UniProtKB/Swiss-Prot annotation:
This is Gem-associated protein 6. Gene3D superfamilies: 2.30.30.100. The keyword Nucleus applies. Part of the core SMN complex that contains SMN1, GEMIN2/SIP1, DDX20/GEMIN3, GEMIN4, GEMIN5, GEMIN6, GEMIN7, GEMIN8 and STRAP/UNRIP. Part of the SMN-Sm complex that contains SMN1, GEMIN2/SIP1, DDX20/GEMIN3, GEMIN4, GEMIN5, GEMIN6, GEMIN7, GEMIN8, STRAP/UNRIP and the Sm proteins SNRPB, SNRPD1, SNRPD2, SNRPD3, SNRPE, SNRPF and SNRPG. Interacts with GEMIN7; the interaction is direct. Interacts with GEMIN8; the interaction is direct. Interacts with SNRPB, SNRPD2, SNRPD3 and SNRPE; the interaction is direct.
Length: 166
């Protein structure tokens, strides 16, 4: 087993958003690490091309011989990599906007007699009746629950709130 495969997901995570040189199957690959698969140790490298496009390369974890960090990167590269695969309608919210959205949704759900609280460990996550959570930016797609009926009803309420507030 090679050195790369002996590492674990937490160690692989240290390479994320950094420029690396990877040797795999006696070939050398260079690029920015977008992610590493925690099961297979596969590496996804991104290279920004001069024409403004990018190339994405997947390297199989079992073939990796060495990985060397060549550049730690900076905040702008990290932001660019983080937003590569976000849809165009995805927008960033300021902390103030998120707080307004959270409070507005919380009032709306209370008005509709839905028991809503803020989770103790994360003041950003809303919790409905202890069985559903709503994460920022507090849209229907940000709801999580194993109870499909409650999930569907709360998502419908949130959608109605968004439509009413536009």
């Amino acid at each position: 087993m090679n050195e790369w495969m002996k590492k674990g997901p937490l160690e692989w995570q240290d390479y994320t958003y950094k420029a690396v040189s990877v040797t795999a199957s006696d070939k050398e690959y260079k690029g920015w690490v977008l992610t590493t698969d925690p099961v297979s140790a596969n590496i996804v490298l991104v290279n920004f091309l001069e024409d403004g496009s990018m190339s994405v390369t997947g390297i199989m974890g079992h073939a990796v011989q060495t990985v060397e960090i060549v550049n730690e990167g900076d905040h702008s590269v990290r932001e660019k990599l983080m937003h590569l695969f976000m849809s165009g309608d995805c927008k960033a919210y300021s902390p103030e906007d998120l707080e307004k959205r959270k409070n507005s949704l919380k009032k709306w759900l209370e008005k509709n007699h839905i028991p809503i609280t803020e989770q103790r460990d994360s003041r950003k996550t809303l919790c409905v009746a202890g069985v559903l959570t709503i994460d920022p930016p507090y849209g229907p797609e940000n709801c999580n629950s194993s109870n499909e009926i409650i999930l569907s009803r709360v998502q419908d309420l949130i959608q109605g709130h968004l439509e009413a507030s536009q």
